Amino acid sequence: ASDVYKRQVKHTAKCIADLIEEGYQVAITHSNAPQLGMIHTAMNEFAKAHKDYTPAPMSVCSAMSQGYIGYDLQNGIREELLNRGIYRTVSTVLTQVIVDPYDEAFYTPTKVLGRYMNAQEANEERKKGNYVIEEPGKGFRRVVSAPNPVKIVELDAVKALLDANQVVIAAGGGGIPVLEQDNHLRGASAVIEKDLAAGKLAEGIDAEMLIILTNVEKVCINLGQKDEEPLGEITTEQAKTYMEEGHFGIYNMLPKFRASVDFVEECEGRSAYITSFLSLIHI
């Protein structure tokens, strides 16, 4: 792992330990985009070099990324808690999330994945039935679908750990997308939007608060314009209006607002925050 990644884990662990020290019970999710891309590329390159190996499917790559990041996070948080004299078990739950096979997202893939490819490599990907887009001047990249999360398979395990007063990391990278086929769960060639999965997890464990951490203290409307305005406390109705007006784009802030609105509206007395790590202490 790079030094930057290690510093990020250490910083994240401190911020989460602050919340736990304040008396909060936490379930933690995380993104996995860089790691998933790296694992997927490595698996494909290995399969090219060793023809008797089959490339690992997307679902397996997602599982690997949960183990990779979960391992570092749980040890970072555990160490930080022990340094403060707090004795709590921290564990990562390998989490599968059921998606709808008829989700419209499967017909319009949007999430780029892995390294840039040349035209020949892109053609090989297309022959496998994968979607590829061209980024002018850079090359080609694979794109995968981002279906909505329907149900978290291991939810009861997460709840049991929380009931035992443990710190839980779950639904990392949005969870491993799976399709229900009778009693069988089949991995889907997709990624789940991590913010929506976080909201689904928060609903499932009946959390009082959903906190989505990003790199800005406050989200702005009219971003980059003269009338740019940072948002403070708003209602779900206001949030929906801003979403309809297109203030939050498609791929960045919009899923965070969708998850927040769904979570708050599903049950009375809930709140959601979209803010930075540094602003956690003000919540």
PLM regions with names:
Residues 46-168:
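Ligand-binding beta-strand-loop-alpha-helix segment within the catalytic cores
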Residues 33-49, 224:
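Glycine-rich loop at the start of a catalytic domain that most often binds anionic cofactors/ligands
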Residues 7-17, 57-76, 80-83, 145-163, ...:
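Polyanion-binding loop/helix "lid" in catalytic or ligand-binding cores
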Residues 1-5, 283:
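Short, small-residue-biased leader/transition segments that mark boundaries at the very start
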Residues 33-37, 99-101, 176-178, 217-221, ...:
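Short, active-site-adjacent cap segments at secondary-structure transitions
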Residues 44-47, 109-111, 187, 227-231:
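Short, hinge-like loop/turn segments at secondary-structure boundaries
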Residues 11-15, 19, 24-32:
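Long, well-ordered hydrophobic secondary-structure segments characteristic of membrane-embedded
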Residues 25-38, 89-94, 168-171, 210-216, ...:
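Short beta-strand segments at enzyme active-site cores
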